[in-house]
Amino acid sequence: MKKITFIGAGSTIFAKNVLGDCLLTEALNGFEFALYDIDPKRLQESQLMLENLRDRYNPSVAINSYDDRKLALQNAGYVINAIQVGGYKPSTVIDFEIPKRYGLRQTIADTVGIGGIFRSLRTIPVLFDIAKDMEEMCPDAWFLNYTNPMATLTGAMLRYTNIKTIGLCHSVQVCTKDLFKALGMEHDGIEERIAGINHMAWLLEVKKDGTDLYPEIKRRAKEKQKTKHHDMVRFELMDKFGYYVTESSEHNAEYHPYFIKRNYPELISELQIPLDEYPRRCVKQIENWEKMRDDIVNNKNLTHERSKEYGSRIIEAMETNEPFTFGGNVLNTGLITNLPSKAVVEVTCVADRKKITPCFAGELPEQLAALNRTNINTQLMTIEAAVTRKKEAVYQAAMLDPHTSAELSMKDIISMCDDLFAAHGDWLPEYK
């Protein structure tokens, strides 16, 4: 029996999306879905939910939960990763509250920035442990990573383990649809070309019937900027740098040195920047889960429609050899010629029989590559820190971060990092 293992299966809604999609995929009939999570209650809830979907849609699939990660991984062909090390409490709270003491504010803190750095430092060692188990139990399996920070985690796996890894994110697949909806434009029939890095890839070309749509996009965007809306940071970046970025304004507000600034507090209101957005989302998600738990977990009539997630389609392509094209995160093996070779880039990829082939993207416009490099610098130093476990490398990663370095002195950055080390405690390995 072929096997898909889901690590972090206690994320019940996400497990429903990804594994629910797999249940609706004929090519995956007869598979085992192996569930693993460190929270036994959430694991049981996900199993009950998936069993209800299985009974309704695909009785040929076996749903099994494991409290032993190695057994969950044994003979798996595919491993889906959706873990969050340290969770909302204590780790996310720490990532936001300690920087606030230094006057450093954040919105999401899951990619770069000081929060993204420490999320990477917590998570990379756990992924290395998973990789070690995979090398023993399922060395030929594909590792589909959905966990952020995408670039650092995927890069660490690709550079320091033998596991075949692809990083998957939602931003590319919704980029132009959301843009066109916001501007009141028709999305059907467009052709697009996107490349860059995760959460900072660029809509390089967008055409319909051979006509470049960027002039009309920019005209409408400039008009829309005259009133407040939720995507003002991205439109500002497009106005100044010429291209639209894939990830949301709340994310990009903290990837650059321009937007969250103590000396320009008016920018928060002018550009509708939602400070502390991610902690608010966490609280709301927890509250919503309490309300919907019973209807999701114990509902014998639970339904599912195939979602926009890439996971099931990639696995289907590998099983059937029917190609599937998607935006994936891979090592930059000459794919984007003016970005570093150690960087993880987000480019068009094609999945087919047991492999994923990334597509050549060429040279980015120089201003876009320059913006990408500012984040890549921090990403590469963060991986270096996680591998060497040297505090000095952590300090350097933080000092290279665009937002952190624009707001704090070197002395304060080092002090803040030391406070974060102390607060995270055993969620981090020992650094020297």
From Swiss-Prot:
This is Alpha-galactosidase. Its EC number is 3.2.1.22. InterPro entries: GH4_Enzyme_sf (IPR053715), GlycHydrolase_4_CS (IPR019802), Glyco_hydro_4 (IPR001088), Glyco_hydro_4_C (IPR022616), Lactate_DH/Glyco_Ohase_4_C (IPR015955), NAD(P)-bd_dom_sf (IPR036291). It catalyses: Hydrolysis of terminal, non-reducing alpha-D-galactose residues in alpha-D-galactosides, including galactose oligosaccharides, galactomannans and galactolipids. It comes from Bacillus subtilis (strain 168). The keyword GTP-binding does not apply. Mn(2+) binds at residues 169, 199. It is an enzyme of class 3 (hydrolase). GO terms for molecular function: alpha-galactosidase activity; metal ion binding; oxidoreductase activity, acting on the CH-OH group of donors, NAD or NADP as acceptor.
